[in-house]
UniProtKB/Swiss-Prot annotation:
InterPro entries the record matches: aa-tRNA-synth_II, aa-tRNA-synth_II/BPL/LPL, Phe-tRNA-synth_IIc_asu, Phe-tRNA_ligase_II_N, Phe_tRNA_ligase_alpha1_bac, Phenylalanyl-tRNA_Synthase, tRNA-bd_arm
Protein name: Phenylalanine--tRNA ligase alpha subunit
PANTHER family listed in its UniProt record: PHENYLALANINE--TRNA LIGASE, MITOCHONDRIAL, PHENYLALANYL-TRNA SYNTHETASE
Oligomeric form and interacting partners: Tetramer of two alpha and two beta subunits.
Matches recorded under CDD domains: PheRS_alpha_core (cd00496)
Cross-referenced NCBIfam families: pheS
Catalytic activity field: tRNA(Phe) + L-phenylalanine + ATP = L-phenylalanyl-tRNA(Phe) + AMP + diphosphate + H(+)
Protein residues bound to Mg(2+): E254
Cofactor info, note text: Binds 2 magnesium ions per tetramer.
Domain of life: Bacteria
EC numbers for this chain: 6.1.1.20
Any Gene Ontology CC annotation: cytoplasm
Amino acid sequence: MVINDIESLTAQALAEVAAAQNLDHLEFLRVALLGKNGSITLQLKQLGKLPVEQRKAIGEKLNRVRDLISDALMDRKAALESAALSKRLIDERVDVTLPGRRGERAGLHPVTRTLERITEIFARLGYELVEGPEIEDDWHNFEALNFPLHHPARAMHDTFYFGDGRLLRTHTSGVQVRYMSDHRPPLRMIAAGKVYRSDSDQTHSPMFHQIEGLLLDKHATFVDLKGTLSEFLRAFFERDFEVRFRPSYFPFVEPGAEVDIAWQQSDSSVRWLEVLGCGMVHPNVLKNVGIDSECYTGFAFGLGVERFAMLRYGVDDLRAFFENDVRFLRQFS
């Protein structure tokens, strides 16, 4: 081996390093020159075969060459990485003058909106919002509410029963029973939540939301009931219309009534729409919860939240509320 060979090898190596166009090629050169079997490494391994008088000089020369090539590799790597970063910054450049992307605006479900609207109106009238269990026993769901044993609501085809006799509540009236058992009159409360019945069509769902209200006091009358519900309907729909109380039967009230409103349709015609049920609390219900019906009277009412949502938002099919179609729900955001 002669010095000229080393100088020639060095010049070629530095030229190849300087000409490398990407990091992969540069790594290939590093292995070819300085790797375990690289050309410079092999030269260093051959030093032992040289005469003693040449070994030191050539060894020093090879070490300088190795350091020189190593520095050149690092410099070229830094240059390639810098160039790659600059290109990426140019390619990924953001035009700050472009309009920003608006985030998706979320909104409450129309049933939730309606539920909150109803409870807020009754809160202004002094009613306390109370919750209760969705799995009930026969006593709280039927017996305490004066349902006779033969009443069709107790039938398997109308109610979802568990094997132990418990059931999914068919109304929120059971919450009223629990509340009256723990509180003494005078009292005002509403019970809101999910209820379950074996029914499904365009205007009925196996699960829906119901709000029931109760007032107990001395000398409460049907006139008070009519005034309360008429005020609620005006506040909810934000308009005045004729309200009709039509006699009807419910086991837990006497007398009972259905409430109809004179609803103006899209073609400007008017028809009566049933919107809720109500009545004076039956003396047997008060007796079952230990309240003296000779001293206290009261009224109760119940309404379907989805029914009111359909009327407020002009929805024809109740099932649309539960299909989670974003195109439908986005209208109410």
